């Protein structure tokens, strides 16, 4: 792998505890972590977790609701990667058109990265579909990920609903 092509910065997120969302559902809470360190050696920078702003952008917040600076997040948690779109498609779900884009993310090998993790890239959240150790040499990971649909206040109010 030509590591000089890894020009993007991504943050891996792991599920930790569970929390209740605005609709009363129990959902996992995702926290940033350093994939190059064993979990027992990681020191948390405050209690930071993944949330979304009113426009549906993925953001990191402290437990008290204060924003965690994006530059600090990149400094503390990011790793080099190459993020490139693979395919896009639209489909109809519940009388709405949904767009889905799949991305290929290349990065150095990190032990323990799997489909339960998420990726944060430029305020966008990605669900990991598959993780491949290319060549089986523990040098490079190829991750296939799908961008999560943004959850906005308009989506939650159901303004697109005809009924």
Outline where the language-model segments fall.
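Short, conserved turn/kink motifs that form compact alpha/beta structural patches or helix kinks used as
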Residues: 3-5, 14-19, 25-163
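A short beta-strand micro-motif
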Residues: 10-12
